[in-house]
Amino acid sequence: MAAARPILGRVLPGSSILFLCDMQEKFRHNIAYFPQIVSVAARMLRVARLLEVPVLLTEQYPQGLGPTVPELGAEGLQPLTKTCFSMVPALQQELDSRPQLRSVLLCGIEAQACILNTTLDLLDRGLQVHVVVDACSSRSQVDRLVALARMRQSGAFLSTSEGLILQLVGDAAHPQFKEIQKLIKEPAPDSGLLGLFQGQNPLLH
């Protein structure tokens, strides 16, 4: 019997969606590298708009945690409110209406809470999940690291924003490549990942 073909995790604009999770005002001073991860998520949002990739945005209990931060650039998106530590219940109808959907690109906070639970729910639906590691964080770097390892153990792909952007555009001949090139000309800001990944880190091996 032939071995099962591994899932490669390719992303294409026509079968992908971008999830933006809970980047809200009250988290601003508590989440590690908050400005940096919001900046990267904003870059992903701009690319999604250029490539016509659908985008969904959630807010966790906005009455207490405030609105989405303006620097995300999410004007025109209608946030879906939730209290569940997963985006999926709030987005169920949107997911059901997209039978062509294969890949979810996931940005936001917190890694060990809503990002992890969203990932598990999406994997349970048979979707491929690409966690944008430079656009996800937690209050604690330990929680962030263990959550990334946990998601990888469960079958999610850990990807950088630039890696996913270049997969989505696919070709320097793409009509939007010049605009996208301007967005990635400067490297994504440091969000503390190097210290998590360097050395003999058993959680990510």
From Swiss-Prot:
PANTHER family: HYDROLASE, ISOCHORISMATASE DOMAIN-CONTAINING PROTEIN 2. One of its GO terms (cellular component) is cytoplasm. It comes from the Eukaryota. It is found in: Cytoplasm; Nucleus. Keywords: Cytoplasm, Nucleus. Interacts with CDKN2A. It comes from Macaca fascicularis (Crab-eating macaque). Disulfide bonds: none annotated. It holds the Pfam family Isochorismatase. This is Isochorismatase domain-containing protein 2. Belongs to the isochorismatase family.
